[in-house]
């Protein structure tokens, strides 16, 4: 597979997409949604091949469930595409404008990024999600999914490209790297003449590989240690409920709670309440001060080096007692708090200190870390959750898939 040819085609398509009307882009999305449902039999047959190969390869039931498509899930994906149609198209909108002293009207106008390369693992719905969001924002995309969903992704991309042709848009607006050869990923990361941004969606290893090998700007995110600090002024009963939600609602999510920090003045009262709530569900990984108050915990072990740097993605929770909000903040800084962190408190000054000091992409006061999500934020959809500070931060919706250009309008004006 010649990635340079792929890149050139994507760049040409991006120039056409940049001038496509919202109506034309929405037409393509509507056709994609309809064609997903119309071609359900072929898509599900392809997915069955992936599932069977996954079983033969010894994939876990949890992983197989992530790969699985059925009629209900496929209808849900089609409806997600229809939801993207209903979202406001940011392309062409003015961010701000002003009239300069020389009479020039100067504005910043949103424009597509160009070509977005996305490297992702497992779930086939990501193929449609990314393609839909990129199309809505006038971006061409080059997709590289995991080998576990090869047949599913090939069928999905066929549907997308057919829909693009029917809508009068270039089929190369969405392209897929068919071969699972890892060397092609490395080549994609060097395709800076044609690709404007790389978005990895997967574990820390994938992000690290992209960051170290790419000559293209990379969006880093999707992982980081999530913390909750329970302050001495917090409502303890309500805090236990929030901690349970953050840890146990969906422990495999990147915004699930990893480490609980508890003020020493309420630890003796709060930690037994926590144990009573989560016993049998959660394994507690504890430092000595916390352990002293958790004698009734059924599943508990002493924390060892590296435990507080671990994104558990499971029913495991690190627990530590701290002296105050400042020690909690210091702990978070030391242990990669870059994704989602929260404080439970009724103390306004401590809340503001936490908000201003926490280095995470999303910070909450008296709310679960589980809210860091494009749909929950009212963005409608997300392409990734960025934990870096440049270009975009937190859930990346449609606006985050755009850049801007300066537009100056005048009456044959020359610079003095």
Curated annotation (Swiss-Prot):
Documented EC number(s): 1.2.1.41
This protein's record includes keyword Amino-acid biosynthesis: yes
Pathway(s) where this gene product acts: Amino-acid biosynthesis; L-proline biosynthesis; L-glutamate 5-semialdehyde from L-glutamate: step 2/2
Primary location class: cytoplasm
Keyword line: Amino-acid biosynthesis, Cytoplasm, NADP, Oxidoreductase, Proline biosynthesis
Claim: Amino-acid biosynthesis is one of the keywords in the record: yes
SUPFAM superfamilies: ALDH-like (SSF53720)
EC top class, as a word: oxidoreductase
InterPro entries the record matches: Ald_DH/histidinol_DH, Ald_DH_C, Ald_DH_N, Aldehyde_DH_dom, G-glutamylP_reductase_CS, Glu-5-SA_DH, GPR_dom
Gene3D superfamilies, per the entry: Aldehyde Dehydrogenase, Chain A, domain 1, Aldehyde Dehydrogenase, Chain A, domain 2
UniProt GO cellular component terms: cytoplasm
Catalysed reaction, written as an equation: L-glutamate 5-semialdehyde + phosphate + NADP(+) = L-glutamyl 5-phosphate + NADPH + H(+)
Pfam families associated with the record: Aldedh (PF00171)
GO biological process: L-proline biosynthetic process
Highest taxon of the lineage: Bacteria
PROSITE patterns according to UniProt: PROA (PS01223)
Compartment(s) of residence: Cytoplasm
Molecular function in Gene Ontology: glutamate-5-semialdehyde dehydrogenase activity; NADP binding
Family recorded in the similarity comment: Belongs to the gamma-glutamyl phosphate reductase family.
Reported function: Catalyzes the NADPH-dependent reduction of L-glutamate 5-phosphate into L-glutamate 5-semialdehyde and phosphate. The product spontaneously undergoes cyclization to form 1-pyrroline-5-carboxylate.
Name of protein: Gamma-glutamyl phosphate reductase
Classification lineage: Bacteria, Pseudomonadati, Pseudomonadota, Gammaproteobacteria, Vibrionales
